[in-house]
Amino acid sequence: MLAKYSSTRDMLDADGDTTMSLHSQASATSQRPELGHTEHQRPSSAWRPVALILLTLCLVLLIGLAALGLVFFQFYQLSNTQQDSILQKEEKLGNLSRQLQSLRTQNRKLAETLHHVAEKLCRELYNKTGEHRCSPCPEKWKWHGDKCYQFYKESKSWQGCEYFCIAENSTMLKINTQEVLEFAMPQSYSEFFYSYWTGLSRNSSGKAWLWMDGTPYSSELFDVMIDLTSLRSRDCVTILNGKAFSKDCRELRRCACEKAAAMVKVQSLHEPLSRRWR
């Protein structure tokens, strides 16, 4: 009986072991998926902080881009405003420049008109008295047209008169227009036969007559009476009693000089004569 019990216990033990072994296997089998699920969930929980950080960085980047866009927009508006302001200022400057140019033109025209009126008035006063404080010429010089003339009593050679006129800041007389001819020839009348050198000369009898500035002589204005009694290397022209004569340049004759007249100034019409020649 003991042997039967022992065999039965052994069988129970064997069955128990078998049962326990099966239970253990079942338990182990049922627990494996839980372990796998746990291992599968661990990486997800580890990426959460990283994802949060990346999301935060993205938000910061978006905010930065938005701020940068706002700054760029403000700068763009400011640039457009400044550009409009510059264009407006340039337009105003252009208008002012045109107005200034117009005023300068008007001022120049007024100055020219004033000069013509003053010159006309001064010339009328000068023609009445022969000399007036408004005259644009130096003292004792004759005003005619736009030139001042002086007929000196000193007698010199032609070259001597050239140097004399240069010393007076002038040149020798030049008769190149009918108006000057009608003015200069009456000045040459003299009861003592004093003639005046002009700036007309030529190197030899075959050469053309030239004025000192190189312009040619016009025979349509006046004729030059040639002296054929002697041969000379250089001929110079004098005027006497309304006629022109060819003479030896070394002869002594009076000097006739001319210079450009100064502009008639309005204030000179009100200055005393004695004050003008100080």
Swiss-Prot record:
It comes from the Eukaryota. Residues 74-278 are extracellular. Disulfide bonds join C165-C257, C236-C249. Glycans are attached at N95, N169. Keywords: Disulfide bond, Glycoprotein, Lectin, Membrane, Signal-anchor, Transmembrane, Transmembrane helix. It is a single-pass type II membrane protein. This is C-type lectin domain family 1 member A. GO terms for cellular component: plasma membrane. Residues 18-32 have a biased composition (Polar residues). Residues 1-42 are annotated as: Disordered. InterPro entries: C-type_lectin-like, C-type_lectin-like/link_sf, C-type_Lectin_Domain_Fam1, CTDL_fold, NKR-like_CTLD. Residues 1-52 are cytoplasmic. Residues 144-258 form the C-type lectin domain. The chain crosses the membrane at residues 53-73. One of its GO terms (biological process) is signal transduction. It comes from Bos taurus (Bovine). GO terms for molecular function: carbohydrate binding; transmembrane signaling receptor activity. It is found in: Membrane.
